[in-house]
Regions:
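Short Gly/Ser/Thr- and Asp/Glu-enriched loop/turn motifs at secondary-structure junctions
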Residues: 117, 412, 539-543
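Conserved hydrophobic residues forming the short capping helix/wall of the S-adenosyl-L-methionine
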Residues: 103, 398, 533
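A glycine- and charged-residue-rich anion-binding loop/surface
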Residues: 12, 36-40, 61-62, 352-355, ...
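Broad gene-expression machinery/nucleic-acid interaction feature
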Residues: 126, 141-143, 459-463, 543-545
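His/Asp/Glu-rich metal-coordinating catalytic cores
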Residues: 1-66, 71-283, 301-315, 334-338
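C-terminal tails and terminal domains of large nucleic-acid-associated
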Residues: 514-550
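Hard-cation-handling environments
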Residues: 195-325, 329-498, 502-514, 522
Length: 550
């Protein structure tokens, strides 16, 4: 019998960039298509997406993209992947709407969408897929039961078990248990919160905290959160109605997502409660709530611009209550701390998660993960969606529940897993890695470019310009030194003059400089100017010699 191949293209050893291909016979379906924030050392990079070389090589066999929910780490790569490997997209109403919006921003059309609801079953090639309702920090999140002749795989997606969700739709434990009773070949379950004991707090708790903060606030209330957290936004709106406040949205993603959510009925805001940011001056401070982006301290976000007095319409001032309803994504802690400090400097009363319950996670903690394992009862378990220590801890948790060690498989990027009822084998290698997006360029920035950017950012640049006669090969001008990001020339004229003399000494070794000599001349200038500067001030600027024919 043919085997099912599970091919992770992202989401292993990292929190984000989630993408997994499932292959049986001639058919491939892809679960999720996410991006991840660039690391601090990825200078100038806007976004990081999965390497889809394997999908491009097999593009005629890719039948569908199955999307668990609409967070960026699950849909952020769609504008870059779908044009290169097109296939129909399956997702819930909000998920498809968010992807359509992203594609429209990139002027991408001709992608077929299929809107599904929980419990729907779709047939895609050799696969039958059932979508299963789960609770998460965004509406429309689903798990999936993916069935092929080799067996059924449960993909949990991001989930938690919230018994009091805002929309009243709890994680469908009955359907998950029913699949467990039938027999599940394997389960891929998220590992984000596996290090946390107990249960994740209910989203309803945030509404109670908001109620108390609204009751006590005397001035404007400004709340920063992720635009995709519509259940939390709805709780803010409900408190605005109760306390007679108006609400406005600030930040491109906040405006776009809330507008889209209202259009499809996922967010309900009475017309007389919603106002435009330009109308804020028409209301007293205690009548205003501003919902904005910037919970991660992003430099160009709405909250950061308000705190730094760079926003055209809004500045933080004495008497404002600012609520940061999120926890920092790993790597963003310093930026968030800086923005909190700046908010205090502006005179605001700042509320964040260390002070009050203004954020809860959307991911399952240990006891919820144990319940998922107990209900699904998979033969094989593959932890996903987490850094390596999280995958390891999740594997250990599965073994504590009685799963044989040989049936718990921690995959690495570049590996594939071949599964049948009788055996599981790790194969590979599969092309894998990260593709960096810089502006409109996708994949044209690699490690060499990043190394140069890092070099420039740390030590600056010196350009050495030399003019050489095309006819005689004699030096006609220069060497002229131009410094950028290295030293302030007017205050370091002696240093720059010395470097110029070093470059001149290199040129004087040549009676004539023919084109065949250019490489050796440039290398000589680079090496000797570098050594001169390092000996004097122990710094390593990038040296860029330029020879111009005159």
């Amino acid at each position: 019998m043919a085997k099912l191949r599970i091919i992770p293209l992202g989401g292993l050893g990292e929190v984000g960039k989630n993408m997994t291909a499932f292959e049986f016979g001639d058919d491939i379906v892809v679960v999720d298509c996410g991006s991840i924030f660039p690391r601090a050392d990825m200078l100038g990079i806007d976004l990081v997406i999965p390497d889809i070389t394997y999908l491009e090589r097999n593009r005629e066999r890719v039948r569908a993209y199955l999307i668990t929910h609409g967070h960026e780490d699950h849909i952020g790569a769609t504008p870059y992947v779908l044009p290169r490997v097109p296939a129909p997209v399956y997702g819930t109403k909000l998920t498809c709407a968010l992807i359509r919006g992203k594609l429209a921003e990139h002027n991408i059309g001709n992608i077929q969408f299929h809107i599904v609801k929980p419990k729907d079953v779709v047939e895609v090639g050799a696969f039958s897929v059932q979508f299963i309702k789960v609770s998460h920090s965004i509406a429309g999140a689903v798990a999936m039961a993916i069935t092929c002749p080799a067996g059924t795989v449960i993909v949990t997606g991001d989930f938690k078990i919230d018994y009091t969700p805002i929309d009243g739709e709890v994680t469908d434990l009955n359907t998950l248990a029913a699949w467990g009773s039938r027999g599940v070949l394997a389960m891929l379950a998220e590992s984000t919160n596996v290090e946390r004991p107990g249960y994740t707090m209910s989203e309803k708790k945030i509404g109670e905290t908001f109620h108390n903060l609204f009751k006590d606030a005397k001035g404007r209330i400004i709340i920063a959160m992720f635009a995709s957290n519509l259940h939390r936004i709805q709780q803010v709106v409900d408190n605005c109605i109760e306390f007679g406040r108006k609400i406005c949205f600030v930040g491109r993603s906040m405006v776009n997502v809330t507008k889209l959510a209202m259009e499809i009925g996922e967010l309900k805001i009475p017309q007389d409660v919603f106002i435009d940011v330009g109308d804020l001056d028409c209301y007293e401070d205690d009548e205003i709530v501003v919902l904005t982006t910037g919970s991660q301290g992003e430099p160009m976000s709405g909250l950061t611009r308000m705190a730094n007095s760079e926003h055209r319409k809004l500045q933080i001032r004495q008497g404002d209550t600012v609520i940061i309803s999120a926890t920092p994504i790993p790597g963003n802690e310093i930026m968030v701390s800086r923005i909190i400090d700046q908010l205090y400097r502006c005179g605001a009363n700042v509320i964040y998660n260390r002070i009050a319950d203004v954020h809860v996670s959307g991911h399952a903690c240990q006891e919820e993960l144990k319940l998922m394992h107990t209900l699904v009862k998979p033969k094989y378990f593959i932890p996903v969606h987490g850094e390596y220590r999280m995958l390891h801890r999740h594997a250990h948790l599965a073994q504590e529940l009685g799963m044989p060690e040989d049936n718990v498989i921690i995959l690495e990027m570049g590996q594939a897993l071949e599964l049948s009822e009788d055996e599981a084998n790790i194969t590979g290698p599969i092309p894998n890695g990260s593709v960096m997006v810089d502006g409109l360029g996708v994949g044209d920035v690699g490690n060499v470019v990043l190394r140069d950017r890092k070099h420039l950012s740390q030590d600056g640049l010196i350009i050495v310009v030399v003019g050489v006669s095309r006819e005689t090969g004699l030096v006609t001008s220069g060497p002229e030194l131009i410094s950028r990001g290295f030293v302030y020339v007017r205050e370091n004229e002696e240093l720059i003059s010395g470097a110029r003399n070093v470059a001149m000494n290199v040129l004087q070794r040549y009676d004539r400089i023919e084109q065949s000599d250019w490489t050796s001349v440039k290398n000589g200038i680079n090496d000797e100017v570098h050594n001169y500067l390092f000996d004097l001030i122990k710094r390593n600027p990038m040296i860029l010699p330029i020879i111009m024919e005159t």
